[in-house]
A protein has these predicted regions:
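Extended, charge-rich alpha-helical interface modules
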Residues: 1-85
Length: 85
């Protein structure tokens, strides 16, 4: 199946970012309750970029749903995103 053009746009944007920048992008979504198709592409591309880099996202992603309930930090020792709070 072909990726949607907006997913591809976000995926390319995130591929050029450093991990701290990706964490900042994630944390800007915390508490945002608005939902649109565009946000779905954005959020999935963001999670996919963390996964592409081999980062453990199990605190925020169960393979189906992404939780933006808490901000995260990057734990370099364990190569994972850890929730704060």
């Amino acid at each position: 199946m072909q990726q949607h053009i907006y997913y591809t746009k976000y995926a390319l944007q995130f591929a050029d970012m450093q991990i701290p920048e990706l964490v900042t992008v994630f944390n800007h979504q915390v508490g945002n309750t608005g939902w649109t198709g565009m946000r779905a592409y954005h959020d999935q591309a963001l999670i996919d970029e963390f996964l592409r880099r081999g980062i453990d996202v199990s605190d925020i992603y169960n393979g189906k749903a992404i939780s933006f309930a808490h901000p995260v930090r990057y734990d370099i020792t364990y190569n994972r995103l850890a929730t704060i709070g």
